[in-house]
Each structure stands twice: as C-alpha cells, then as structure tokens.
C-alpha cells in the first residue's frame, strides 16, 4: 500500500494493456461488449484477445443501420401503403390459417437518425440496442471470432487499411469461431468499486451534507488483482504498507476525487464493472455529491457518456433505477442474488453472508462508527483495507459462480445482451419469442419445402390479455380479435374456457399424505411433465383461437413457434449434456457446455410459468392435463400390486404398491412385501431392481412422450404433510424438503431440530431424537451471548415499503400505515445512525426483547442488540419449538405424548427461567373434531374464488418471503387418518 498522486497512478497504468500490436488471421478474439451509436449509425465492438500469454484489448467499428418496428395506422385502402409497411400475423391469438388471420401492419425504421418520439413508440422498446444488434447481425456478445486478414491495432483501435468494416461485407472481414475448437477461454477484465461515506456518528449518511471518505476499486486481469483507493481528506495523511499492487491516491477536493475515479476507468479498462447494492446506494449517493449530475465515463478515445438509467421492478414490486454504463458492462451483484430463486439457501443477501457461504471468507471487521472516528483521526489504513476487501469479494463471488459463462450463454442462445444480466425470465422469453416470430419458418405440407412464415410479437397484447382492471370487457376479449365461426375451427381444437373470463391460477395435483415414518419408499417422477404436456397439446400463443361461441380454443398446430422452440431446447440440452460429459481434458469446455445445458433447462421449464403470468387459461389447461397424468400414474402404479410377472421375476409371494404422496409430477410409493423373502444384505439391490421394473411397466402404458423415472430409493422417509418431508436417499445422504429449511427460523433451532430428526432417520428411535433435541437446545441456551454468534439466534423479515404501484383507476389507501416488525427495526436503525440501513427487499435480522408490549414493539435489530445489557425474549423461539413438538406428535401419535411432553417441559423450563414478561407453560389439549384436517368443501373453494386476485397476490407475496410453495391445490378426496388426537399449546403463567 503506497500513496501516489493521480498523475503517478495514470503513469503506472499507462502500459497496463498494450495499445499497439498486430493481430494475425490465426489470433482468436472475443467480443466482450457492444455499443451502438445511433447518432452516426456505427457499431462499436469491444474485444479481448490473448497475445503471447498476455491479455490485449481493442475495439473496432462497423458502419451499419439498426432497425426498430412501429405500428402503421394508415387506412390501407390501396394495394400499397405510402409508409411501406409490412403485414404480419399477430403472435397472440391470430386465428385460423386459410380462414382468417389477424394482422398487424408494421413499419421497419432506422433508429439512427430517427426522432425520440419514434423510438418511444417502437413496438420493440423493451429491447436494448444490443439485443437488436444480436438479432440483426452475426456480432453477438460472447462470440469468438477471427479477422479474415491480418490487422494492426493502433491506439487500441483496429481499422482495416484497405476499407472500413461494413455489415454488408461481414463474411469477407470476419470469421465466427466455434468455441468447441478452442482449448482456453478469453476472460473479460473485471472491476468492482465501493464507497465509504462520512456521518456525524448518530445519523445515517446523507449526500446533502456528508462527504464520501473514499472510493475503492479492485481490478482483476490476467489472474492478478490491482487495488486502488481514492481518498478524500482535507489534511495531509500518511499510510504505511508495502503492497506494490495497492495504490492510494489522496485528494483534498472531493469533486476532484470523484472525477478522477471515473476518469481512471480509461486506464484500468475493465469490461465488467461490478458493485454491491450500487444502484440503490453508491451511484445515487455519488450523484447526490455531484448535485444531481450523472458522472461521465469514457473508454479509449471514444467520447465520454453519462450512464443511462432504467426502472427496475422486482417480483414483489420494489422499484429502483438500474444504471447502464454504455461502453462497459455494469452489474449490481446484489440485484442478481435478490432476483435469483436458486440462491435462497443463504440466510440473507448481505455481502458478508454470501462471502462466508460461497467463499468461506469474510469482510474486514470494522463497524461504521469506528471507521468514521478513524477517518477523523487520520488513521486510514484499516478503513482502506475494509473498503478494498468489499471490492474484492464481489469479483470473487462472480467468478466462483461462473457468472461470466452464464451471462454470455444468454447472449449466444437467446439474443439477450450483457445489460440483461439481471433480467427476469419473462424478459428472456419475450425477447426470444420476438426474434423467433420474425424468423419463423414452417414446412409446406404439399411441397415439403421450408418456407418463411413470420409473425409479429406485440408485447402490448400480453398486457391486454392478462390485465385485471375493471372495464367493459375482461379476459382475452380485450384483444379485440375477430371471432372465428365455430364451423371453421380445426376438428382437434381444445376448448380452454370463456373469452371474457378473469381466470385465477390453479396449481398441480397434491395428495395429502398421512404423517409417519416409512421404510423402503421410492420416488417415481415424470421427466419434464409440463414441458411434455406443452409439446403434446401444442401450447403456443399462436395456436389460440377466439371463437364466435364465446370460448377460447387451442389449435393443434405442431409447427407452432413455441412447440418448435421446446423441441429444439430438448434436443439442444441432450446434445450439450453429451458434449459436457465428453470433456475430460478441457475444464473450459466442460463449464461452457454445462452452463448452456442448464440455461436450456431453465428456459424450457419457465415457459409454463410465463403462461401462468400472461395466459392463465392456457396455463390452467396444462395444469389440468398434469393432474390427469399424475392420477393416471397413481392408478398404474397401484395397479401393479401383486402383478404375476413381478411376483415371478423376484420370487415373491406378495408385493403391493401404495402411493403415499403425490405432488404435481412426482409420487412416493411404498412397496409392501414379506421381509423374510428378501435377504437383508441384498434388500436395497433387490428393491432397486423392483423400482426399475415398475418404471419400465408404467412407461409402457404411457404414450406421446410421457415418461416417468425412478429417482430415489429411500431407506427411511419421514412424511409430515404436503411439501414437508425428509429422507435418506440412495447415496445415504439426508435430504430435507420444505421442512426445517425456512429462513424465518433461527439457525440454532434449525440445527437442533434437524439433528434430532436425523436420529429418527438413522436409527428409527424417537428417544434418541428427544435426547438429541434436549442436549442441543440446552447447549445453545448456555452458549447464548458467549461462544455462539448472535446471528444463530435471530429471526429475519423482509422490508417492503411502498411495493407495487397504484394505477390511475385505483384510489390510494387512506387507512393508517401498518408498522411491521421490519419497518419498526429499520426505524430504530435509522435513529441510531448505523452504517447500513436496509432498503426495499432486504431481510432485517432481529430478536425480541423481554419487555412489555406487542411482538412488533419487542422487535429489536440484531445489529444493535447487546446481550450484556439487554434481555432477550424467548417467546417466539418457544412458539417455533411448540410447532415442532406438535409435528413430532403428528408423526408418532398419541402413544408417545408422555415422552414428548417430558422433553418439551425440560426445554421450556430452562428457557423461561429468567423471563419477566414472556413466561409460558405447556399444556396438552384435546383436538376438536372440527380442527382436524379435512377435504376442502365446495364452500371453501367458492370462498377462494371470491377472494379474487388481491388475495392471490398476497398469498404469492407471502410465499416469496417465506420460501413456501403452497399455491398448489390439495387433493383430499381420500380420507386421511391422523395419528394424534392431542396437541401442545403454550399458555401464560397466571
């Protein structure tokens, strides 16, 4: 770590990357980023290549026109249109070929030179310019290429000495390279920045009055990290250290520091610029210090540009700006983790939590007040270390999760762009449909030739079709399509429902299981059930027909766009998996193929969810077919009980099958046989063969691509209720599904409960389970505030303020604002002036204090809790324990109430011994018959229907917050008995 002037820093990085070099015809380069300049009609491609073991960067330009589409509103009374528009079939519910097809007249116009109004009215305004380039040219971000002729790079720019590059002569100038022919990949240069802000020590930092103390920047290139810290301090400071790759530049003017930081990007020249929550905090704060101005970012000798901003709305309605850096890829990594459901296994999305989980590393331990005090005393070394570590960790996370491969795979496979990195799956599918609609082909049934058959994907139709606003028309009638006569419908069309019906989503079939412990159950699951259904029934928006009889029908056109896409994705994934598995020497190619096959799977599986958003009629029919297939599978499986062929093959006198549990596309099957007929030492092997035989027999009864696969032989299975179970799988590993996994349960309770349940799974012994539970719960009580971290004992709740939006037709609520636990804790954090104030979508860790008041009033942010001066309330912890003890009672039954009660009482006594306001005792009470679980009545179903969309939205929001997925319907047509007639309840001491 050494202090340098900004001029010295510039000089040190002047040769950071070669500026002048030769590129031969054999040198492969990779397009990292593209930018289209609409003012001059020029595409700028930023590229990286390897020269003599060193990364070299350059750019080239291509003169080209870029096109968008707008609707033509001419009357079209003549044969030709003065606007030279083209007529396309509409993508959504176009009609019936050779009868009537709804058309949309579209003008293709040049974006370069067009007015702002034209661009704002474009039908493809949801796309970035980079998406358009990907769809209209062979230049795609992430593509490997070669020059057809040897070139010379001068001042980081490659220009052909003979003539400028032009799109019309692309094949003469460039060759696209198949990555399968390569042995190593070309990586982007990575950078990450972070700011530290000053405060008075009592309140949160405010850009109106609090300066930026420093801006850290880490750059990764050629496997080497360089770290730079831009520091603002009015007085002279000294910093010790001898790290040659850490540079500290001290400014006595804050504005100069900010300007120099952004100017330095031209020297470091990263392809990807990361931050963590930068869209919400860092960048708006910097703008605040610049009096609202956006900073300028330049690259090479190109003119510096201000970042663009675009509104980003999360799935729970939170709204923030996303910053796009034009010449650079900018990614707020916090948004990626917040948007990706696959990352829900972490406790929260704080940088320290993610770093510990994925990297086994932590931030520098420095609280905010101490940092400000050290800054005031000119002790900057620790602050700089803290700042730079926060810059290193996001880069390491990005690379650990191989997000570069993910980002560029999306570009190559679906014409997304690097600016779409945090886009939701809906945007991915809409962009894919837009491109496929324009380039669609079909095979002529008469000639057998492949002919062009374009459609136009108008995204506005999706909004009209799915809107729930009150009005004179509802449902799909908003599309205003001409109704097709009933006599002209294709004979095999499927009726989906009424055109003007407002449809609520219906989930898959779920059988309510009887709680218990089962041995040797096995799972038999459908392979990609909903994907197979969509192919089988030809589910596509182009196949929708609005009929004169008032109903929506689904045509069975197997050449529909989505059907072709799904078949392509299935084939593509199969081929990519084979390519991946054949890579024994190249880690680069293995990772590339693995990322691409995962993306194929994710896209195919998400199309059903896409229909669930925009066309619930179609989604509900898909779900209905899924329920029918699961019901049929259950009948087939149980119908194999005491099958003569199976009995003979395995030399058994009896072999019955009972489906214990079914959920959407999977079944849990319990085989019953005489234990003495299968030797214990070969039991698992024999049962595996029986499972495989059942799979073969069931698949022989299905047609049209429906297949089931034997997934797991579970030596022990514990079923609690729907979507809540655990088991020991075929690899002898314990798996928990939906039970003891939620983030709103403290870590120590999760650990104690899971450890206890493992005793049942491993030993089928309830007493060992209770002994383990008692030992661990008492141990964690004694370790509170001493040897165990406080985070193990905390709860967390997501903070949402003003989520969603109020439409013009809706009146704003006048009722008093509800103070949630999260809001209450956030206000405490604000008043105390902590270093991190949670924003919308953040989970806030908290505990309850043992004070008088409601649960909300007791809630206190964990960040401020001091166990030496504050007394924790165990009220909520014991409520969770009460639920767990009742679950054990439900599994094991009334005959074990005494043992359960003894264990429960011992734990409760320990935790209640010092409580002043929240002291509880446990009582065993009789369950009323009306309380018992029963099949939903018709009244209940009607009540759900009357609840309407708002209730469903609330249910989904709760589901997102708690990692639940209980929207699916429950099929309780069979009476399910219960093991217990008693339950535990907590009561206050009188």
UniProtKB/Swiss-Prot annotation:
PROSITE patterns: DNA_POLYMERASE_B (PS00116). SUPFAM superfamilies: DNA/RNA polymerases, Ribonuclease H-like. Residues 936-976 are annotated as: Disordered. It holds the Pfam family DNA_pol_B_exo1. GO terms for molecular function: DNA binding; DNA-directed DNA polymerase activity; nucleotide binding. GO terms for biological process: DNA-templated DNA replication; viral DNA genome replication; viral genome replication. Residues 960-972 have a biased composition (Acidic residues). Its EC number is 2.7.7.7. It is an enzyme of class 2 (transferase). It catalyses: DNA(n) + a 2'-deoxyribonucleoside 5'-triphosphate = DNA(n+1) + diphosphate. Belongs to the DNA polymerase type-B family. Replicates the viral genome, host DNA polymerases cannot substitute for the viral enzyme in this process. This is DNA polymerase. It comes from Choristoneura fumiferana nuclear polyhedrosis virus. The lineage of its organism: Viruses, Viruses incertae sedis, Naldaviricetes, Lefavirales, Baculoviridae.
């Amino acid at each position: 770590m050494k202090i340098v002037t900004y001029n010295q820093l510039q000089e040190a990085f002047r040769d950071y990357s070669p500026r002048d070099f030769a590129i031969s015809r054999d040198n492969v380069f990779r397009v990292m980023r593209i930018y289209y300049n609409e003012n001059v009609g020029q595409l700028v491609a930023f590229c990286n290549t390897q020269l003599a073991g060193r990364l070299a960067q350059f750019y080239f330009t291509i003169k080209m026109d870029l096109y968008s589409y707008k609707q033509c509103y001419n009357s079209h009374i003549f044969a030709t249109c003065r606007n030279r528009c083209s007529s396309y079939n509409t993508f959504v519910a176009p009609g019936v070929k050779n009868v009537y097809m709804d058309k949309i007249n579209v003008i293709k116009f040049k974006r370069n030179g067009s007015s702002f109004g034209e661009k704002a009215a474009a039908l493809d305004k949801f796309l970035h310019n980079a998406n358009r380039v990907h769809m209209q040219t062979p230049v795609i971000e992430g593509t490997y290429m070669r020059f057809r002729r040897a070139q010379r790079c001068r001042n980081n720019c490659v220009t052909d000495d003979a003539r400028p590059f032009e799109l019309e002569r692309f094949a003469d100038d460039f060759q696209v390279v198949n990555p399968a022919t390569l042995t190593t990949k070309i990586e982007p240069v990575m950078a990450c920045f972070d700011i530290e802000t000053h405060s008075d020590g009592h309140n949160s930092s405010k850009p109106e009055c609090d300066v930026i103390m420093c801006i850290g920047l880490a750059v990764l290139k050629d496997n080497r990290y360089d770290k730079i810290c831009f520091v603002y301090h009015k007085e002279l400071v000294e910093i010790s250290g001898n790290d040659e790759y850490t540079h500290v530049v001290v400014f006595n003017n804050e504005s100069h520091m900010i300007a120099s930081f952004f100017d330095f990007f031209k020297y470091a020249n990263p392809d990807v610029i990361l931050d963590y929550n930068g869209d919400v905090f860092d960048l708006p704060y910097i703008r605040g210090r610049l009096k609202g101005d956006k900073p300028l970012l330049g690259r090479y000798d190109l003119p510096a540009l201000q970042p663009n901003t675009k509104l980003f709305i999360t799935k729970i309605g939170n709204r923030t700006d996303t910053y796009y850096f034009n010449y650079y890829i900018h990614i707020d990594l916090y948004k990626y983790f917040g948007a990706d459901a696959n990352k829900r296994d972490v406790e929260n999305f704080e940088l320290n939590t993610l770093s510990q989980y994925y990297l086994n590393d932590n931030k520098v331990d420095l609280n905010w007040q101490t940092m400000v005090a050290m800054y005031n005393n000119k002790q900057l070394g620790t602050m700089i270390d803290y700042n730079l570590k926060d810059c290193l960790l996001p880069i390491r996370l990005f690379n650990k999760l191989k997000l570069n491969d993910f980002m560029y795979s999306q570009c190559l496979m679906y014409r997304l762009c690097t600016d779409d990195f945090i886009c939701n799956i809906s945007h991915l599918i809409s962009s894919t449909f837009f491109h496929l609609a324009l380039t669609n082909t079909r095979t002529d049934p008469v000639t057998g030739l492949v002919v062009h058959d374009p459609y136009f994907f108008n995204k506005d139709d999706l909004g009209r079709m799915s809107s729930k606003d009150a009005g004179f028309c509802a449902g799909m009638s908003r599309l205003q399509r001409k109704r097709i006569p009933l006599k002209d419908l294709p004979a095999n069309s499927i009726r989906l429902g009424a055109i003007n019906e407002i449809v609520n989503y219906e989930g898959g079939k779920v059988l309510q299981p009887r709680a218990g412990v089962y041995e040797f159950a096995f799972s038999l699951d459908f392979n990609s059930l909903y994907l197979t259904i969509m192919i089988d029934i030809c589910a596509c928006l182009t196949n929708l027909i609005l009929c004169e009889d008032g109903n929506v029908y689904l045509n069975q056109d197997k050449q529909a766009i989505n059907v072709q896409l799904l078949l392509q994705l299935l084939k593509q994934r199969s081929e990519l998996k084979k390519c991946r598995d054949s890579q024994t020497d190249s880690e680069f190619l293995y990772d590339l193929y693995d990322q691409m096959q995962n993306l194929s799977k994710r896209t195919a599986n998400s199309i059903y969810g896409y229909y669930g958003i925009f066309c619930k009629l179609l989604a509900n029919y898909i779900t209905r077919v899924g329920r029918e297939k699961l019901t049929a599978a259950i009948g087939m499986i149980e119908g194999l009980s005491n099958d003569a062929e199976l009995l003979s093959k395995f030399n058994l006198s009896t072999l019955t099958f009972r489906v214990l549990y079914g959920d959407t596309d999977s079944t849990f099957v319990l085989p019953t046989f005489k234990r003495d007929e299968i030797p214990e030492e070969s039991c698992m092997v024999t049962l595996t063969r029986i499972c495989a035989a059942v799979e073969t027999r069931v698949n022989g009864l299905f047609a049209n691509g429906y297949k089931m696969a034997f997934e797991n032989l579970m030596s022990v299975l514990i079923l609690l209720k729907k979507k809540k179970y655990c088991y020991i799988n075929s690899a002898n590993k314990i798996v928990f599904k939906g039970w003891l996994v939620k983030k709103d349960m403290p870590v120590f309770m999760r650990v104690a409960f899971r450890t206890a349940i493992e005793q049942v799974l491993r030993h089928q012994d309830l007493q060992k389970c209770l002994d383990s539970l008692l030992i661990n719960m008492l141990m964690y009580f004694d370790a509170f505030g001493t040897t165990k971290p406080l985070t193990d004992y905390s709860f967390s709740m997501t903070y949402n303020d003003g989520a969603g939006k109020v439409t013009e037709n809706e009146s704003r609520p006048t009722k008093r604002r509800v103070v949630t636990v999260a809001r209450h804790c956030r206000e405490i954090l604000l008043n105390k002036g902590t270093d991190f104030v949670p924003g919308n979508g953040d989970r806030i860790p908290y505990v309850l204090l043992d004070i008088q008041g409601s649960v909300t009033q007791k809630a206190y942010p964990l960040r401020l809790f001091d166990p030496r001066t504050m007394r924790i309330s165990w009220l909520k912890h014991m409520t969770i324990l009460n639920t767990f003890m009742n679950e054990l009672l439900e599994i094991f039954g009334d005959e074990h109430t005494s043992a359960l009660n003894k264990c429960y009482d011992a734990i409760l006594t320990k935790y209640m011994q010092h409580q002043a306001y929240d002291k509880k005792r446990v009582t065993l009470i009789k369950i009323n018959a009306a309380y018992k679980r029963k099949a939903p009545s018709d009244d209940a179903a009607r009540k759900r229907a009357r609840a309407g969309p708002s209730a469903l939205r609330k249910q989904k929001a709760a589901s997102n917050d708690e990692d639940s997925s209980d929207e699916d319907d429950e099929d309780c047509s069979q009476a399910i008995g219960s093991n217990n007639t008693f339950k535990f309840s907590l009561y206050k001491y009188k």
